[in-house]
């Protein structure tokens, strides 16, 4: 019985793997078996003997992955493609189960309490909104009072600084009056802004 071409290649590879161990010899023609040579021969032998089985396994895995990727790409580029019968059946069963679930939920005793719960939730939300709006109004009114106090204090300070007797600041009376009206304009603008708020 003759050897196939792959068997011949395997034997040739084994011969090439054995050559380094034969060549690695001492001057006295004694073969040296160090750890590196043993590891190298074991690795080469593993590659030779496992090439067939591992190659087939990797090839089958890669072929399956390639096919699944191609199917996904076809579905991605052709979304209007006809859906197989199995998926139609699954969708039909899903619709039926959803109908059953909704019927079961509606028949539960808690479903009868849903309108009352809805009214209670609405009442709570309205109460919370009223509390927050009242708090906001109180905060804005207190800020308005504080802003008016700050503006009046600044106005008194700037006017008293300008008109205090013995002031070294030399400016005309018209300029001093104009500068005194600036805080009044600020008060008006602040009140307008606060009314808008």
From Swiss-Prot:
Its main location: mitochondrion. It is found in: Mitochondrion membrane. It is a single-pass membrane protein. One of its GO terms (cellular component) is mitochondrial membrane. GO terms for biological process: proton motive force-driven ATP synthesis. One of its GO terms (molecular function) is proton transmembrane transporter activity. InterPro entries: ATP_synth_Bsub_B/MI25, MI25_plants. Keywords: ATP synthesis, CF(0), Hydrogen ion transport, Ion transport, Membrane, Mitochondrion, Transmembrane, Transmembrane helix, Transport. The chain crosses the membrane at residues 30-50. The keyword Membrane applies. F-type ATPases have 2 components, CF(1) - the catalytic core - and CF(0) - the membrane proton channel. CF(1) has five subunits: alpha(3), beta(3), gamma(1), delta(1), epsilon(1). CF(0) has three main subunits: a, b and c. This is one of the chains of the nonenzymatic component (CF(0) subunit) of the mitochondrial ATPase complex. Belongs to the ATPase protein MI25 family. This is ATP synthase protein MI25. It comes from Oryza sativa subsp. indica (Rice).
